[in-house]
Amino acid sequence: MKRLLIVDDEPAIARLIQKIAKGCGYEVTVTHDADQFMDALVAGEPDAIALDLSLPSIDGVELLRFLAAARCRAKILIISGFDARVLETSGRLGEARGLNIAGTLMKPVRAAELRAAFEALDAAVPA
């Protein structure tokens, strides 16, 4: 089964991502802060990551640096309330560091957008 690791400090958003991902066949681990996220990543690398750029204890760019240093191979979906320019720049930064940035979504995110994003990931993530 495909594994998704979510890091989002907004429980309602994390639940929505989890629900849609499960419906798309993912086994999901939800984390709400950077420490939980890093612990879950060390426990076993997922096939995909849903990453919020705005966390209380660390920003998403620092998490992208951490993922690059860890040589993470997961497909990364960046989801944030920042504007499109910030999302695009973050995606390019991740790619420049060797990460597999699968896409970006701006909050508030709709279920249909999430479903489409996970279906696109399915084409590249083996079951």
Where are these regions (language model features)?
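Conserved acidic carboxylate
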Residues: 8
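Acidic catalytic/metal-coordinating carboxylates
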Residues: 33, 59-65
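The feature encodes the CheY-like receiver
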Residues: 56
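C-terminal output helix
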Residues: 85-86, 106-122
